[in-house]
Amino acid sequence: MGNVSVAVGTAVGIPIAVGVIIALIFWCKLQRRYKKEEIRDADLEKMVMEEVAVSVYDGFKAEINSSSEASTINEKEANQDLKPCQEKTAKAGYTPAYRRQLNASMGTLRPKKQSTAYINVPVIFSGEKVNYGMVRDPSYSFMYPLTLSRKETSSLRSASTSNLSSSTENTALHEEIKLDDPYENDFTNYTVNKREFIDSLRPR
């Protein structure tokens, strides 16, 4: 009886023990394989993360460069668009220095009303002197207000006009017309132009 039980136990126990041992061996191998794969996966993840970080950095850098270039181009275009506008406004709003001074002192230079006559051609009467005002009328570019100061009576003037010699007439015609214009230049030299016009009226 005892031998039968031993034989049955050995016949059943030995294959079970062998199977358990083989299962343990395969389990150990699988565990080692899993560990190796985990280490390999960790290395791969590190490499992938590094590549992703580099690609993201490159893309961000390229985007920054493109945005900076676009901003510089926009600034240049804006400056180019503003230049003609600034030149137009500067040309439209330019006021010469003498005109600013005259406009500022317009009220102080003409405080009193005087009898004025606007003429295009200056006329010098014999025996009289023409006293030109220093303020130019801004609405008429070629007209000046005049103030005629008579030093002689009408009878003396008629006598002097009839008895005036040629030398006196020449001196009267060549008398310099003084314009107290501190802003007179080559383009606004009214004195020379008026003198030439008066010389052209002389009989030859």
UniProtKB/Swiss-Prot annotation:
Membrane topology: Single-pass membrane protein
Domain of life per record: Eukaryota
Record's keyword annotation contains 4Fe-4S: no
Keywords assigned: Cell cycle, Membrane, Transmembrane, Transmembrane helix, Vacuole
Localization in the cell: Vacuole membrane
GO cellular component: vacuolar membrane
Ranges that cross the membrane: 6-26
Protein family membership: Belongs to the SKG1 family.
Biological role: Involved in cell cycle progression and surviving DNA damage.
Protein name as annotated: Altered inheritance of mitochondria protein 20
Gene name in the database record: AIM20
